[in-house]
């Protein structure tokens, strides 16, 4: 698995919102980006963390402390 420094600032923002349970539409609205852009970042996160789905991605986010949970 890649390290946290391999994740972009935007990918970390998207990951934080995914962990909080937001949908792609909600993330797009919060970050003022398109749903397609959110989906691109989700795809990149899955690839960079070798995750098969968002549930696994969220588990790895907690396990490897990929985000600041404050």
Predicted regions and their residues:
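Intrinsically disordered, low-complexity regions of eukaryotic proteins
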Residues: 13-15, 58, 70
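Helix-turn-helix DNA-binding segment
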Residues: 2-35
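Recognition helix of helix-turn-helix DNA-binding domains
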Residues: 23-56
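Short, basic, alpha-helical segments at the C-terminal edge of helix-turn-helix-like DNA-binding modules
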Residues: 54-64
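Residues within well-formed alpha-helices
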Residues: 13, 48-50, 60
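Inter-domain helical "communication" segments and dimerization helices
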Residues: 1-6, 64, 69
């Amino acid at each position: 698995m890649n390290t946290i420094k391999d994740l972009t600032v935007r990918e970390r923002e998207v990951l934080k919102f995914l962990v909080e349970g937001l949908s792609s539409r909600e993330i797009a609205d919060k970050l003022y980006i398109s749903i397609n852009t959110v989906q691109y970042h989700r795809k990149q996160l899955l690839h960079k963390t070798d995750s098969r789905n968002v549930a696994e991605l969220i588990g790895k986010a907690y396990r490897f402390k990929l985000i600041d949970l404050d």
